[in-house]
Amino acid sequence: MKNISEFSAQLDQTFDQGEAVSMEWLFRPLLKMLAEGDPVPVEDIAAETGKPVEEVKQVLQTLPSVELDEQGRVVGYGLTLFPTPHRFEVDGKQLYAWCALDTLMFPALIGRTVHIASPCHGTGKSVRLTVEPDRVVSVEPSTAVVSIVTPDEMASVRSAFCNDVHFFSSPSAAQDWLNQHPESSVLPVEDAFELGRHLGARYEESGPTNGSCCNI
């Protein structure tokens, strides 16, 4: 089975294409704003990233995975206000994540402790975690694992990657799913957390920029 560095290198290469490229400057600021629990206006994104409002609007229109409300405000991009199986509680606010790995990666990017609850994709048994920015505090059950896929392309982050990244209560609970997805793997939660830290590092220095296409 691949180690964390191999998974990280392959996913980094995949994330360097398609929709994921715009996440370099957009993702972390947007994630922090979504963590407040309210829809995010385009004007707020522009102010936070240093991009013109029209440029932010244009980029959002190119992202097939982004979730918008009727007013054009962002309500989901990795972290979402819409219910998913992956419950993500931060500062008493009930939010949701697109996939299991998101729940492990996002605490470091938003700088907050998060309480996570997600059903085992194989049995429905609840998997519960508390994750701080720099460590996994608790996992119940302790045998829980995370499925990982390495798609060849990432035109849509959610459909190509997130929709196949689940929690399982144990490796045995994941076996039927693995039999149906032979190119996939599972990692213990601690290893998946480290993989998330590797992948999240590309966004950690993102901040206001005055550039244009070269930063997209």
Swiss-Prot record:
The keyword Lyase applies. Transmembrane segments: none annotated. Keywords: Lyase, Mercuric resistance, Mercury, Plasmid. This is Alkylmercury lyase. Its EC number is 4.99.1.2. The keyword Cell division does not apply. Cleaves the carbon-mercury bond of organomercurials such as phenylmercuric acetate. One product is Hg(2+), which is subsequently detoxified by the mercuric reductase. NCBIfam families: lyase_MerB, PRK13239.1. The gene is merB. It comes from Staphylococcus aureus. One of its GO terms (biological process) is response to mercury ion. It catalyses: an alkylmercury + H(+) = an alkane + Hg(2+). GO terms for molecular function: alkylmercury lyase activity. Signal peptide: none annotated.
